Amino acid sequence: MLFPTEFDVIVVGGGHAGTEAALASARMGNTTLLLTHNIETLGQMSCNPSIGGIGKGHLVKEVDALGGAMAAATDEGGIQFRILNSSKGPAVRATRAQADRLLYKQAIRHRLENQPNLWLFQQAVDDLMVEGDRVVGAVTQVGIRFRARAVVLTAGTFLDGKIHVGLNNYTGGRAGDPAAVSLSARLKELKLPQGRLKTGTPPRIDGRTIDFSQLEEQPGDLDPVPVFSFLGRVEQHPRQVPCWVTHTNERTHDIIRGGLDRSPMYTGVIEGVGPRYCPSIEDKIHRFASKESHQIFLEPEGLTTNEFYPNGISTSLPFDVQLELVRSMRGLEHAHILRPGYAIEYDYFDPRGLKASLETKVINGLFFAGQINGTTGYEEAAAQGLLAGINAGLFVQGKEAWCPRRDQAYLGVLVDDLVTRGVSEPYRMFTSRAEYRLSLREDNADMRLTEIGRELGVVDDIRWDAFSRKRDAVSRETERLRTTWVNPKTLPADEATPLLGKPIDHEYSLADLLRRPGVSYDGVCGLRAGACAAPEALAEDDVLLAQIKEQIEIGIKYQGYIDRQAGEIERNEAHESTRLPEGVDYAEVRGLSFEARQKLTQFRPETIGQASRISGITPAAISLLMVHLKRGLGRRPTKPAEPGADNKPVTQ
């Protein structure tokens, strides 16, 4: 049957990508339908019970700056918060939180059920409705046909998913959920470039059988307790609890080696490539054979359960080997496993078949987000979902897509890496992937993106008001520090020396003093018995005040480096903003090598900047392209070749 209501946007899948996509589209005023195989699993944390980390926390802050739900839900469900790399520079500091699975899921569902313009419907999707080169809807497993002007597909690990425990395997999207076999087959018929990846999860342990007296306690940050959202408050956090640390040992490693003959990874049963930066314990003892021990973190799954997640022993070994290896570690000698660990193999689609908007190049109005694009991690999925939801909304409104640049957001780095370089293994975000990371910090994600989000329609009045107050306070106070001066007469040696280490010998602005190593904003404001402080409070609450102080201090201390990076960004702007028309015939570009012509024709980059990041495209090739552009590009008389004509990703 045809469902009586036609929607602007349909989102398929209710994981971290799907929920952010649906919320973003609906916030923009588009009638949006979220189709999920099970409403009870909306926002479910399928693997580790944590959000954030190095690079990942930056993405969460960016999602939050654009009005997304992940950071706010983490503040409501987070049971331990830490700032990683707190002793290092601001570019690599990152927030990480342990989350109560149930509280997090409840927070996400509450937002979905109370979002205007958003409808939920429980049915698995088996097919897409495609007319010509455009998607027009989706078909569920019982034949209900939903029509829409755009579709966002966020299928996670469900596409033809296969779960492995030892040499036993069965179809599934994750433990307890069916795989999307029909939908995967349908996508392959559409000639989208496809491949196979693998990920895994560890066994879960009953906390009542753990001897915590044998373990090292790892508490969260308590003074102050961090918050994730720019609008977050410590009072939103539930009760805070510690994690615990144990280690593998030689006996553990011997047990694992003894079970490799029954490992699906080492017997050729699993063909998909696993994540390099979240390897299974089998991979660890093989790749790091000389290492005698690996650190294992026991992470609580929630406040109302005894279940613990042993971070670091993801495995697909047979259950008897899993039980033996768990019990070989200190504190786990009598551990009871509640759920076995497993590996899951699933289809993904080569992201080089996508535009920078995450719309597929071969089917108009069809957007992909999350693990379907070859990424791994909740945060990477949420960021892609947000962008796909925004661009699906812009698509149905007849507006130009928003494609964040590499110098603008980690989201821009993530998408640019995917659509220009593709993936040969599950992609994970790190700060090292961003060449402009000093400008892309967690603390300034709102300064970079909230104004853009307001223009796009995804930032509400409450967030906009809070941001405006923060932005104005930072601007005013920074200017005051730069224009307020002290000299040896107004700042005597006995006042200057305790803060600065020596007296001042001539006139300085307060900003000059703050720029010195070891000098804090509060320290400068405390000079002259507090006479150097701002004449009025910068903010009414402590969290916003801390954010303002951090912005001011970083902006002044790192101004020289930030200005230098801004100059580099400006020099590269010409390449990033120079678009390549869709009909470019690269065979007509004089001097291009055969390899360059082949790759440019296959991947169809949208800008000169994207072209420069394709493997095998040299600076000389870019120069030839620029010359060709100035002459006036020849165009192909026919439609560009489908990037996935052979239905397989091309290895770079």
Curated annotation (Swiss-Prot):
GO cellular component: cytosol
Record InterPro entries: FAD/NAD-bd_sf, GIDA_C_N, MnmG, MnmG-rel, MnmG-rel_CS, MnmG_C, MnmG_C_subdom, MnmG_C_subdom_sf
Cellular localisation: Cytoplasm
Protein residues bound to NAD(+): 274-288
Required cofactor names: FAD
Transmembrane segments: none
Positions that bind FAD: G13, G14, G15, H16, A17, G18
Family according to the record: Belongs to the MnmG family.
Stored PANTHER family: GLUCOSE INHIBITED DIVISION PROTEIN A, PROTEIN MTO1 HOMOLOG, MITOCHONDRIAL
Function: NAD-binding protein involved in the addition of a carboxymethylaminomethyl (cmnm) group at the wobble position (U34) of certain tRNAs, forming tRNA-cmnm(5)s(2)U34.
Name listed for the protein in its UniProt record: tRNA uridine 5-carboxymethylaminomethyl modification enzyme MnmG
Organism whose genome encodes this protein: Paraburkholderia phytofirmans (strain DSM 17436 / LMG 22146 / PsJN)
Species classification: Bacteria, Pseudomonadati, Pseudomonadota, Betaproteobacteria, Burkholderiales
Gene: mnmG
